Regions:
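Repetitive helical segments and hydrophobic/amphipathic motifs
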Residues: 11-12
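C-terminal motif of bacterial Sec signal peptides marking the signal peptidase cleavage site
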Residues: 15-19
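Conserved active-site regions of diverse hydrolases
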Residues: 21-502
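Positively charged n-region of N-terminal signal peptides that target proteins for export
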Residues: 1-4
Length: 502
């Protein structure tokens, strides 16, 4: 069970927050809604989970109804836009009973006296739909998946070449997301893709491979960072495809730095509170044994002397020189039994205390301070006396890899928007604005990137709430209006759903 504890004080602050400032000041009643130079009669949205309305760790009907493309389409209908169809799932829980790993949505429940996000149990099987759908957002899709044939082939699900979310509504087993979008002959399109090309690496704690320089995505694993040229080429193929059916007008967005979202910013690096007695014990049993050895090896700063109050988590950093043999030899020469010396050397050869440059995954909360099976005290406490594995932490070097890839992606996306004459949404800049202490305000309600209390992000810490998607919808609307001289009104984020409390 995932246990992310939310204090009652935080809930009160969420429910009572107000502000005299607002970023939503236009009087909608005075706007004459027009399409300007655009034709909204057939709008198709391409993208990934963010486009589909995915939130709370699942795809469910109410979330889909509050997808940002659905909000945009609603405003387009006031300016000649047509119907906007979505491949709605059959329930408000999400997940699939017949596909392993696809759980139902997260909900807030009281666990041991604290509000905690807990996954639901899926109630529906993977359904197969017919017809065409304006919302072509596919959760989990990377840039190159949009142009991949067989991505909706049920036979490829076990091997990972197909995606069950596209299997649901693909027109055939051999089609691609792009081909099904083209078949609708759109007059206008939106494209927001690229997040997953780096996000899966980040949410896995960097256990994938940075594939920069490898332009063959068929060799990638699911948690790898996509080569920037592969991303740019895939997006160019999508844009050429849209142009080939006459959809020369549209809007494209860049991607936020994924490390700025609550999944990576909620758990602090110094999440270990110690009293005087426990700090002294750990200093004597662990730090005191290792730090002199590390200091002699010129690596004394790997471990910090523990203090009363908040202390850094102990992590494994695979970029560090492995000092297992040196630690083992030093301990043995100091009279430590051979078996214990070998264990300590192996366990702490690449261990260090986390710093503010490391990011702790939201899902790691349930692991910290748990016992490691088969390891004796005092060395068995995850993140305290036993180093957290790489999958639980983004180290500063991994954060840097993500930043470099994101910057490269965004440079290409901006250039492609200019080359194809499209409206451009700077989603990265909006995320930075949301991340500021003041957040942004809409009609007296403040939105930020804070987990749960910020109002923008859902319980999975990665995807948005209905209100968060409304904030994004407005960025698309503003970009469309600026480029095509349309007058689509913005939506009011406060009219959409946020976190639901029990």
């Amino acid at each position: 069970m995932k246990k992310i504890i939310i204090s009652s004080l935080a809930v009160v602050s969420l429910l009572s927050v107000t502000s005299c400032k607002t970023d939503f000041e236009t009087d909608m009643s005075k706007i004459q809604v027009t399409s300007g130079e655009a034709d909204f009669s057939k709008y198709v949205a391409l993208g990934n989970s963010l486009t589909s309305g995915y939130r709370d760790g699942a795809l469910y009907a109410d979330g889909q109804r509050e997808s940002y493309p659905a909000m945009i389409a609603g405003q387009m209908q006031r300016a000649g836009g047509g119907a906007f169809t979505q491949p709605l799932v059959p329930d408000n829980i999400g997940g699939f009973t017949n596909v392993p790993g696809f759980r139902g949505k997260l909900t807030l429940q009281v666990v041991n006296g604290a509000l905690t996000p807990v996954y639901s149990t899926a109630v529906s099987t993977l359904d197969r739909l017919t017809g065409t759908y304006n919302n072509m957002g596919v959760p989990g899709a990377k840039s190159f998946h949009l142009v991949a044939n067989d991505y909706g082939n049920v036979a490829g699900m076990l091997s990972g070449t197909a995606n069950p979310y596209f299997v649901r509504f693909a027109s055939s087993s051999t089609t691609s997301v792009l081909e099904d979008a083209k078949a609708q002959n759109p007059t206008f399109f939106s494209l927001w893709i690229g997040n997953n090309d780096v996000l899966s690496y980040a949410t896995s704690g960097g256990v994938g491979t940075n594939q920069t320089g490898n332009t063959n995505p068929s060799t990638y694993s699911s948690n790898d960072i996509t080569d920037p040229n592969v991303l740019a080429g895939s997006i160019r193929t999508v844009l050429e495809g849209m142009r080939s059916v006459g959809a020369t007008k549209g809007v494209i967005a860049n991607i936020p730095n994924v490390t700025s979202i609550p999944f990576f910013t909620t758990i602090p690096y110094n999440a270990v509170p110690l009293n005087e007695a426990y700090a002294a014990t750990l200093n004597a049993q662990l730090v005191g044994r290792l730090k002199p050895i590390l200091t002699a090896l010129g690596q004394g700063d790997r471990l910090k002397t523990l203090v009363v109050g908040q202390n850094p988590l102990l992590i494994k950093d695979e970029t560090l020189a492995n000092l297992s043999a040196q630690i083992t030899a030093a301990l043995t020469s100091n009279g430590v039994p051979a078996a214990l010396a070998a264990f300590i050397g192996t366990t702490y050869g690449q261990a260090r205390h986390a710093t503010s440059e490391d990011l702790i995954l939201l899902s790691t909360k349930s692991v910290i301070n748990t016992d490691v099976t088969g390891v004796l005290a005092p060395f068995n406490k995850q993140g305290i006396t036993y180093p957290l594995e790489d999958k639980y932490v983004l180290t500063k070097s991994e954060v840097r890899e993500i930043q470099i890839a994101t910057d490269a992606y965004n440079t290409s996306i901006r250039a492609l928007a200019e080359t194809y004459g499209l409206a451009f949404v700077d989603a990265n800049a909006k995320m930075i604005e949301l991340g500021k202490n003041s957040g942004i305000q809409y009609n007296g309600v403040t939105y930020s990137t804070a987990f749960v209390t910020g109002g923008s992000f859902s319980l999975d810490g990665v995807h948005l709430t209905g209100r968060g998607y409304a904030v994004i919808a407005n960025e698309f609307i503003k970009a469309i209006n600026a480029k095509y001289k349309s007058t689509l009104p913005q939506v009011n984020p406060n009219n959409y759903s946020g976190i639901k409390f029990p």
